[in-house]
UniProtKB/Swiss-Prot annotation:
Region (G3): 400-403
Gene assigned in the entry: infB
Record-stated family: Belongs to the TRAFAC class translation factor GTPase superfamily. Classic translation factor GTPase family. IF-2 subfamily.
CC annotations in GO: cytosol
Name of the featured protein: Translation initiation factor IF-2
């Protein structure tokens, strides 16, 4: 055998060099590196070691020997089957057997001596079967006979090794016999150890009995002695525990008193869960789930139930119920007793309404003698302003509403919180869409109208036209026998403004407006916003009571303490009476415009009620989303394609503007493109808005607000673009364009040419060839065609050939003759028309 290096051997055996070196070292072959060579002798030694390891199979068999009672002894038999010479096996067997027998005899004699040295204890031991071997091994250990000489075991059974018989699985008698002898020795030693263990337990019980009885056995309790004797009798001569002899049970004739089921009164609130209902009825949730299943409702323990379903479950399970009044706290807190207060006359609350750019703010500006219009972008009022004006005949509170169509909800709120509506109509424009809408809101709120025909100073002004148009909409002037006062005014020159104020005060006298000037204040939120350094700021119109600085107030889902109050001129005030607009600071958040404002004496109750309202809003929103998902699922069934979503983050200067823009943008949604406003708020654009825009791939829109420096830096890093607007028209138009870009283009067919068949020829190569005259447009070889007969489409396909005389042509223009071969169609007749068209993509528009 040729010499080989360690590295070559490792490569041939697919082993690592280090692992091979360790294996060689374990076989007694010392090598240090992969370059060392292996001699033929070393290779032979290595092969013998490997073969001897492979030819040895260790087998382990575990059986259990039962002692009397509940105890078992596990017998583990290990044997090795080795393929070797017979002589070696016989010699090893001959040498090992005498030594093993002598060792076993010595160990057995030692164990017997240990047992003989134990203390003599009186015990009556019955002769029982000592050891039972498993039935499959078919061997037994003979029963020993021990003399009754107290508790001391005077003789041990002689265990003969020849009596242990085992099955020979592999036919190797010598190795099996050797393993069986070892197993018998182990069984015997374990039996002796067990006996010794129980002797120790007996001594411990004896000592415990002595302690219980005092100094000696004589003073022991007889009951304890009998119990100890019973314990000692439970062991046999091998120390194995006997089976317990149970005394026969004496049957007693007893009468079980019937227990009446507890009937509970369960308080049920809307949206109660299965687990809550189960807890109130003191039953498991699974039982209620079973009842629901029998009713045909699949539910889990966390499922919310409506009150009707919960009532059925409670009655089904035999309990009583009471319905929880969720408005109990709100009624207790918000209802104010004013029976002890007197009413006084108050100033009228007047809302100026009308179409865009008809001069509402200019008219109010003239009345207030200030210049507010210059601050509004494009001369359009972006949010509601509340102002108090004092005249010679009394005070008037004005609410200015935007005229744009997006601010419908604002006008609706303005109509609800007002006493008189001044409808401004431009004399040169007449009645416009928002004018009609203002009339509808005023009539719905049952508020009297005073019409101000504005811009009367213009040459093209026509007040009679305005009167006739309004009369068609049931706004009848007093001169025509109606109840509506018409006043011609000019916000530019001030003409007729005094007459308008006099008409308003006259109307208020007719209405006999009164309010409580004392007690806890009530009002309505006209506008709200978030100002840097001041926090949430709300413009509130007080309707009843006296609002004072330091009062605990509740506005919708927000609460707080009035830290400061300012009037419409920006001056700090300590108190505000009915029909007074004020700005208040100190709320926990920005309330929604139109929320009711109430003063609550207990701040804790205000906080609790605000949390309850917030929870109701969340539950209503979740329920609405679930119903929308369900309806959308049915509506979208059968529709192909996926709906595109334009995600928007909207930030504005005031709550009313944000709400109005939100409603306008949501109305733009179609079946193909949906507007999803994932976040909206008041104040500057912050870095959190940018992070949200990056995570959700949304567009950030700011209305009359800008991004702070941190947001700008983050936007430059993440590539987020801000869109700033100060006029609502531009914002809505840009969003429409963005939505149009998300629309999938529409495929449209356009006819580019028509050829009339004049004669038909037969060709062996192409079949029927139509001799045609192009009567319209151009016929192109590559475009699809239709064959028309009597203006009815009879075939649609493509051209196989287009020839001008004998030459192939790519296209033939109007007025020229050509030969046309239609692919896979031979039924061309004279008088047919071949229509050539093309498919083009057309961008969709909203």
């Amino acid at each position: 055998m040729a010499e080989i290096t360690v590295g070559q051997l490792a490569q041939q055996t697919n082993k690592e060099v280090d692992a091979l070196l360790k294996q060689l070292k374990s076989f007694g072959i010392e090598k240090s590196s992969e370059k060392d060579t292996l001699t033929p002798t070393e290779m032979k030694t290595l092969l013998e070691k490997i073969n001897s390891a492979k030819n040895t199979a260790t087998r382990k068999k575990v059986t259990s020997v039962k002692l009397d009672g509940k105890h078992k002894i596990n017998v583990s038999v290990k044997r090795k089957r080795r393929v070797a010479k017979k002589m070696e096996q016989q010699e090893s067997t001959t040498l090992e057997q005498p030594q093993e027998l002598e060792t076993m005899v010595q160990e057995v004699s030692q164990q017997v001596d240990i047992v003989k040295e134990q203390d003599n204890i009186e015990q009556i031991v019955e002769n029982k079967e000592a050891v039972k071997v498993q039935e499959q091994r078919q061997a037994e250990i003979a029963k020993p006979v021990i003399k009754d000489s107290g508790f001391k075991i005077t003789a041990m059974p002689e265990i003969k090794i020849e009596e242990i018989v085992a099955e020979d699985d592999e036919g190797l008698a010598a190795s099996d016999k050797q393993a069986k002898k070892k197993a018998a020795k182990k069984v015997f030693s374990e039996a002796v150890n067990t006996n010794t263990k129980y002797k120790r337990e007996e001594e411990e019980k004896k000592s415990k009995a002595k302690k219980a009885g005092g100094k000696g056995f004589k003073k022991a309790n007889p009951r304890q002695l009998s119990q100890l004797a019973g314990d000692l009798e439970s062991f046999d001569e091998f120390g194995a525990k006997k089976g317990k002899l149970k005394a026969p049970k004496v049957k007693k004739q007893e009468f079980t008193k019937p227990v009446e089921n507890t009937v509970r009164t369960v308080e049920i609130h809307e949206g109660i869960t299965v687990s809550e209902l189960a807890q109130k009825m003191a039953v498991k949730g699974a039982e209620i789930v079973k009842v629901l299943f029998n009713m045909g409702v699949m539910a889990t323990i966390n499922q919310s139930l409506d009150q009707d379903t919960a009532i059925l479950i409670v009655e089904e399970m035999g309990h009583k119920y009471t319905l929880h009044n969720e408005n109990a706290l709100e009624e207790a807190v918000t209802i104010v007793d004013r029976s002890s207060y007197k009413k006084i006359s108050r100033a009228p609350v007047v809302t100026i309404m009308g179409h865009v750019d008809h001069g509402k703010t200019s008219l109010l500006d003239y009345i207030r003698q200030t210049r507010v219009v210059a601050g509004e972008a494009g001369g359009i009022t972006q949010h509601i302003g509340a102002y108090s004006v004092k005249t010679d005949k009394g005070s008037i509170t004005f609410l200015d509403t935007p005229g744009h169509e997006a601010f419908t909800s604002m006008r609706a709120r303005g109509a609800k919180s007002t006493d008189i509506v001044i409808l401004v109509v431009a004399a040169d424009d007449g009645v416009m869409p928002q004018t009609e809408e203002a009339i509808q809101h005023a009539k719905a709120a049952r508020v009297p109208i005073v019409v101000a025909v504005n811009k009367i100073d213009k040459p093209e002004a026509d007040s009679d036209k305005v009167i006739s148009e309004l009369a068609q909409r049931n706004v009848i002037p007093e001169s025509w026998g109606g109840d509506v006062m018409f006043v011609n005014v000019s916000a530019k020159t001030g003409e007729g403004v005094a007459d308008l104020l006099e008409a308003v005060l006259l109307q208020s006298e007719v209405l006999e407006l009164e309010a409580f000037a004392e007690g806890l204040a009530e009002g309505v939120v006209i506008e709200s916003r978030l100002e840097k350094g001041r926090g949430p700021v709300a413009t509130v119109l007080v309707q009843n009571g006296n609002l004072k600085q330091g009062d605990n107030i509740l506005c919708g889902t927000e609460y707080g303490r009035v830290r400061a109050m300012h009037n419409d001129l920006g001056k700090k005030i300590k108190a505000a009476g009915p029909a007074t607009p004020v700005e208040i600071l100190g709320l926990s958040g920005v309330p929604a415009a139109g929320d009711e404002m109430v003063v609550i004496e207990n701040e804790k109750k205000a906080k609790e009620l605000a949390a309850q309202r917030s929870q109701k809003q969340k539950e209503a929103k979740i329920a609405q989303e679930q119903s929308l998902k369900l309806s959308n699922m049915f509506n979208n069934m059968g529709k192909e394609g996926e709906q595109q979503v334009l995600k928007i983050i909207l930030k504005g200067d005031v709550q009313g503007s944000v709400e109005a823009i939100r409603e306008s943008l949501l109305k733009l949604s179609t079946d193909e493109v949906k507007v999803d406003i994932i976040a909206s708020g008041i104040g500057a654009i912050t870095s959190s808005d940018v992070t949200l825009a990056v995570a959700s791939t949304a567009v950030v829109i700011g209305f009359n607000v800008r991004a702070d420096s941190a947001a700008k830096k983050l936007a430059e890093t993440d590539g987020v673009e801000f869109r700033y607007y100060n006029i609502i028209y531009d914002l809505i138009d840009d969003v429409k364009k963005a939505m149009s870009g998300l629309l999938s283009p529409e495929m449209k067919e356009q006819i580019i040419g028509i050829a009339e068949v004049r004669e038909v020829y037969r060709s062996s190569k192409f079949g029927s060839i139509a001799g045609c005259m192009v009567i319209e447009g151009v016929v192109k070889r590559t475009n699809p065609i239709r064959v028309l007969r009597n203006n009815v489409v009879i075939y649609e396909g493509t051209l196989e050939s287009l020839k001008r005389f004998k030459d192939d042509a790519s296209e033939v223009k109007k007025g020229l003759e050509c030969g046309i071969g239609v692919k896979n169609y031979n039924d061309v007749r004279e008088g047919d028309q071949i229509e050539v068209f093309e498919v083009i993509e057309v961008a969709k528009e909203l």
